[in-house]
Amino acid sequence: MKKDPKDTKVVIGMSGGVDSSVAALKLKEQGYDVIGIFMKNWDEPDEYGYCTAAEDYEDVRRVCEQIGIPYYTVNFEKEYWEKVFQYFLDEYKKGRTPNPDVMCNKEIKFKAFLEHALKLGADYLATGHYAQVDYKDGEYRLLRGVDSNKDQTYFLNTLGQYQLSKAMFPIGHIDKKKVREMALAHDLVTAKKKDSTGICFIGERNFKEFLSQYLPAQPGEMRDLSGNVKGKHDGLMYHTLGQRKGLGIGGSGSGEPWFVVSKDLKNNILYVVQGEDHPSLYTYGLLATDLHWVSEKEIPQTFTCTAKFRYRQPDQNVTVQLTGGDTCKVLFDGPQKAVTPGQAVVFYNGEACLGGGIIDETIKTVQEL
């Protein structure tokens, strides 16, 4: 079992945000030997020449000095570029909508960074994620954070037994409001800092402008399912399934808004439908690849559980059928809207995250089931 806290070295990944600040504070209060480390994964100021990494590191430095723990920075720009950003671009080239946060946790935080922490002699790697780990029936389990609105197990679904045996999530059992209150009570400089949103390497920048720096946009036609041209799109990569905003199509026809329903990569056509309950927006199942399970015990060929197809979505009842290798078919109990290839599908049994995969394609008709 765990050693005495004072003899236990914990490296905590610090982002300059309030969550990792309070996580570090909690570890220090519990008596652990804590080292704060800031990961530099991206080296590029925004279009105004402003580098948020410099400000974030300054916040890490000030918090660590307030708490009284040593702090360092480590550079994973090369690994991040190769493992996360290239994947991000490749998925967009395929007309899909990737989730770089899942890949960052898999390849950077709980791989490259974990290895770095262990080389420093750490017993554990801690982060400010809203998630929990426990040990039951001879295995580690990944459990949802108690703050259901902030739970981040969706992004941590690729963690296995080894990673969980080394992971600590000090604020997983606290809700966000309490985290802010703790930061304020200790006068941490990050107490009132707003939460970061969106994709980390884009930050507050315009997504379209950012992506166009790396992938040439190919404008094309927007059509309805009958083939009628409804407008122009700036590039398929700028659109995701179920999208309503930014299409620039007036409410012609029934007057209802238009939604993205599919992409024809070969002919560079964006297909749209009218009305938020249009049948074509719904799917009945999906095929997933790159499956990963938290448990190392044998998984049944067919089982029922709940799943999320996007972050913060309420759990949906599904039946999972393993189809060999790292693939599966997921059948929905009821039709689901805007399930998007490239995103993660993550499975749950009650509070436990079972694992997940990448949505490869959707099943559009009952006949395909």
From Swiss-Prot:
Disulphide-bonded residues: 104-200
Catalytic activity, EC: 2.8.1.13
Domain of life the protein comes from: Bacteria
Cellular component GO terms, alphabetical: cytoplasm
Annotated ATP binding sites: 13-20, 39, 128
Enzyme class per UniProt: transferase
UniProt keyword ATP-binding, yes or no: yes
Residues the record marks as site: Interaction with tRNA: 129, 343
A GO molecular function held by the record: ATP binding
UniProt subcellular location: Cytoplasm
Biological process terms in GO annotation: tRNA wobble position uridine thiolation
Record keywords: ATP-binding, Cytoplasm, Disulfide bond, Nucleotide-binding, RNA-binding, Transferase, tRNA processing, tRNA-binding
Function: Catalyzes the 2-thiolation of uridine at the wobble position (U34) of tRNA, leading to the formation of s(2)U34.
Family: Belongs to the MnmA/TRMU family.
Protein name, as recorded: tRNA-specific 2-thiouridylase MnmA
